[in-house]
Amino acid sequence: YRMSLRYSLPVSDGGNVSNLASRNTEYAVVYDFYPNGVMNISSAYSLNAESAVPLSISSILTMSSDLTKATWYGRGPGETYGDKLYNSTVDVFSSSVSDLVPSYLFANGGDRSQTRWLALTDESGTGVLVTSDTNNFAFNLSKQYPHYLAAYASDSMNNPYTVLSIIGAPSGCSVPSTSDQAYLVSDSSIEPGSVLSFSYRIVPVSTTDVSAYK
């Protein structure tokens, strides 16, 4: 089963609304669903050259709070970004989901970059695996959506779900606590007028399946 969606995201500068159509950012996403529970997601963005530069191009997924363990193959073990990699290495890392959730109010943070695959599982080892054949991606976990405004971090820490961001195009570090990192890499910004695409797959897994990826 396939579902295709297309959006036009208008950009307003307070001018004549009739001029906005020519300044839209176009966004398309295709979902392919399979009988075995596998889901493929492909996204494409055409950013208007006059539009504001987004913090990232990503998919925001609502995950069950029963998925309490994270295992990933990518940069770690601490948070890393496209332009700041800390003293990280590329390896397989495991952590509780709660330890990966930032306790501050910034909408973006706690990223793990250059990820090849990510598994989120419950206590029995059952869960989902996110992987991509075409792109390395970044991810972060939170207890609130990026657009949600809370007065205090504690307002959202007990939410009965976990928010997973799959980031296909990050724009570098946006967290002040890591601003002193000095290991910089190129291609860590999103340029206005860019055409960007990324795809990934979500696969139901058990502990045995995850072990096969290691």
Task: Please state what every model-predicted region is.
Residues 1-214:
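Beta-strand/loop-rich accessory regions of lumenal/periplasmic or secreted enzymes
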